[in-house]
Amino acid sequence: AIRIVNAQEKALTGLKIQCTLENGESATLTTDDVMPMMVRKVKFRIPGATSSKKGETKATVLLQDKSGKEIDRTEISLQQKDASSIHERTFISDVDGSVQYYSVNPSTTQGDNQALFLSVHGASVEARNQARAYAPKDWGHIIAPTNRRPFGFNWEEWGRIDAMEVLAEAEKVFKTDPAHTYLTGHSMGGHGTWFLGVTYPDRFAAIAPCASYPDIAKYSRPNADAANVGEKHLPMI
């Protein structure tokens, strides 16, 4: 996605965005309208590269009005990766039609029906960093959703929806085994692991929260966890 600034008093409708790689491959998409005096991040399509080149590549992004007239253009840098290496994927969210991304640390072996490890990140951590914190596995794919921005309400509310949208998308793309879907996370992601695990117990074979906190309301209170030790329903290890 890319931000468009409409600094005029009339709406921009029927916009098209053309993305052209440095090798000439191109893709055009009719994108979202931008209302007057508004900044909006809108979707565009990057053409699937047919070359085997890896590393940085340049792309020109051209914004056109509905008549095909050029409004603006910019150049972006992309990292072209092999699907067997750690990489990012995008999808269109059902919440608001926006482009969201998740990171993939793929299995070192080929084939369907492998395990899926959903790893939810801590506060102010990007999915791309989360996925790269793990060594690749030979029996499953590590999938790291990025949430809505770095915090996303502690993986509750809209963060919860993002995590489950990514899970559904990754299951479809990698054709993983639903009986071997696991959930983990660290810090804020540890809280997310508890929250997602108890909200969707039928979706995960096991959960592993790390350095987590059980309750947002108690998170900022001094010695809040220590106060829970005496509660019989919440054993501390």
Regions found by a protein language model. Name each.
Residues I2-Q8:
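Short edge beta-strand/loop segments characteristic of extracellular beta-sandwich folds
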Residues L15, N23-Q114:
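A domain-start/cap signature at the N-terminus of enzymes
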Residues T108-D112, E156-M188, V198-F204:
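Gly/Ser-rich "nucleophile elbow"/oxyanion-hole loop immediately N-terminal to the catalytic nucleophile
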Residues D112-A123:
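Short beta-strand element of the alpha/beta-hydrolase
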Residues S124-V173, S220-R221:
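Cap/lid segment of the alpha/beta-hydrolase catalytic domain
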Residues N147, A208-K218:
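Active-site nucleophile loop of the alpha/beta-hydrolase fold
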Residues A217-I237:
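The feature captures the conserved acid-bearing segment of alpha/beta-hydrolase catalytic domains
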